[in-house]
Amino acid sequence: MASAPQPTLPLFYNDLMPLNSRDHGKFRTKQIDDAGFLKNQHAVPLTVDEFVQAQRNFPIVFSSGDQPLPLCLMGLNEGVNTYVDDQGKVNEPVYIPAYIRRYPFMLAKLRPDADELSLCFDPTQ
């Protein structure tokens, strides 16, 4: 018997867990000093609102397909990010897209048929 297909997680995310006060009431956040999750990522999604700031540091390209998505290009070869070194440090001061800044948090539906979104996080980070 076949199982239901597993939903694909968004870029960077290994797992998503809903944040709740009972289990995570004592959690604290800290600034991420290691951008190792970016090392092998050559393109990152952008919003239109970010174009002015992002274009100062990155070329902006659009994905192909039925619903093109704006991307900031962080490297010319797939799997190579020229802005992040092997230790996960950003090489120079550049604009960091909102998609990266929000990680490890994300608003997500807990059920496909749900209308409301829950604040989730990647517990592997």
Model regions and ranges:
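Short, extreme N-terminal leader segments that mark the start of a protein/domain
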Residues: 1-72
